[in-house]
Amino acid sequence: MVADVLLTHFNQLFCLNDPGHPLTGQEMKKATIVEDGYIAIKDGLIVALGSGEPDAELVGPQTIMRSYKGKIATPGIIDCHTHLVYGGSREHEFAKKLAGVSYLDILAQGGGILSTVRATRSASFDNLYQKSKRLLDYMLLHGVTTVEAKSGYGLDWETEKRQLDVVAALEKDHPIDLVSTFMAAHAIPEEYKGNPKAYLDVIIKDMLPVVKEENLAEFCDIFCEKNVFTADESRYLLSKAKEMGFKLRIHADEIASIGGVDVAAELSAVSAEHLMMITNDGIAKLIGAGVIGNLLPATTFSLMEDTYAPARKMIDAGMAITLSTDSNPGSCPTANMQFVMQLGCFMLRLTPIEVLNAVTINAAYSVNRQERVGSLTVGKEADIAIFDAPNIDYLFYFFATNLIHQVYKKGQLTVDRGRIL
């Protein structure tokens, strides 16, 4: 077979054999590092991988040849938890955070999520589209090729749908692949204050059926937290969403452990997000139910908290984990997955291989894209992040700097030395 594109002489390729399930426990520690590696691409797919000189049959007169001595390649990075589409920003809350005002106290003062809800409700489709596109551009420039994007800053149908429509438009227009999550249950809107059940009924009866009918989202999510939605309320919504055919995610055990992990396990959610306050019993329940733990260390960093999710304990117990940005205007205003990956080493005490497995193959399972992306595997799409680093460890050792040299998306050179092509 003659390749369209042949990428050769990488110092290292980060490869693994996809076992057909998210990596857990000791599997997280394993990968194949191919020295002097090459990748052959045809019709946007990986058709060959190896070490040394490529087979002669891969090279034809039209084959584009590129050498990458001194560089490493990984699968395109996957950010599987973002709040991509929103209006406004919340830098005015930064001084309060520095003064020690808690996230929940800011929310109680009318700030936090509700502040962004007001800004998002007043924002036009074009405003939201352009703002979200800028964030996606930034992510792409840092090696991200697939992004999960939640609604949740409307808390009314008109605005929630506008957010979902923006995600759908960007999925068509932007090189990054987007996976849509419906999260109208991100907070209790002011007009339903004191009556969350009534709001959930509106979501179930009036919103979810339209989202499903118009194929606006693949997943449904809810914020199960103290002063937001209880475990029973979360179970009520997610069970109805599951009956309608949605895959499930849940924000759980971020600030307090109030039963969100139990809901995730009972309903076989694909992932439970945050988990800073998870208990040993909660870890065991998620393992038993096969729920992926989606950890968001940049949120803990941004909130200046001391309690990070117990990633080391989770992996050693046999749990599958991912790492994501939680990109949002309040608790985590970043879109830099390289920073998140480095926090995975510095703050969660994970190894570079564990982090890379978390943000590639496990993240692909978290967004139900494992058949297409998440590993450098023959037959999968050629989503490739190429770093200006001599080896895998350097990517974490030399921190707080964008080390992306190039990005390939579906076999097309999409980012080249700081420029989107």
UniProtKB/Swiss-Prot annotation:
List of residues binding Zn(2+): H81, H83, H251, D326
Cysteine pairs bridged by disulfides in the record: none
Primary residence: cytoplasm
Top class in the EC scheme: hydrolase
Binding of Fe(3+), residues: H81, H83, H251, D326
Family matches, as SUPFAM superfamilies: Composite domain of metallo-dependent hydrolases (SSF51338), Metallo-dependent hydrolases (SSF51556)
Protein name: Imidazolonepropionase
UniProt-annotated binding residues for 4-imidazolone-5-propanoate: R90, Y153, H186, E254, S331
EC number: 3.5.2.7
GO biological process: L-histidine catabolic process to glutamate and formamide; L-histidine catabolic process to glutamate and formate
Gene it is expressed from: hutI
Family annotation (InterPro entries): Amidohydro-rel (IPR006680), HutI (IPR005920), Metal-dep_hydrolase_composite (IPR011059), Metal_Hydrolase (IPR032466)
Organism of origin: Streptococcus pyogenes serotype M3 (strain ATCC BAA-595 / MGAS315)
Cofactor needs: Zn(2+); Fe(3+)
Compartments (UniProt record): Cytoplasm
Similarity field: Belongs to the metallo-dependent hydrolases superfamily. HutI family.
Pfam families: Amidohydro_1 (PF01979)
Pathway: Amino-acid degradation; L-histidine degradation into L-glutamate; N-formimidoyl-L-glutamate from L-histidine: step 3/3
Keywords: Cytoplasm, Histidine metabolism, Hydrolase, Iron, Metal-binding, Zinc
Cofactor note: Binds 1 zinc or iron ion per subunit.
Residues annotated as binding N-formimidoyl-L-glutamate: Y153, N328, G330
HAMAP family: HutI (MF_00372)
Catalytic activity: 4-imidazolone-5-propanoate + H2O = N-formimidoyl-L-glutamate
Role summary: Catalyzes the hydrolytic cleavage of the carbon-nitrogen bond in imidazolone-5-propanoate to yield N-formimidoyl-L-glutamate. It is the third step in the universal histidine degradation pathway.
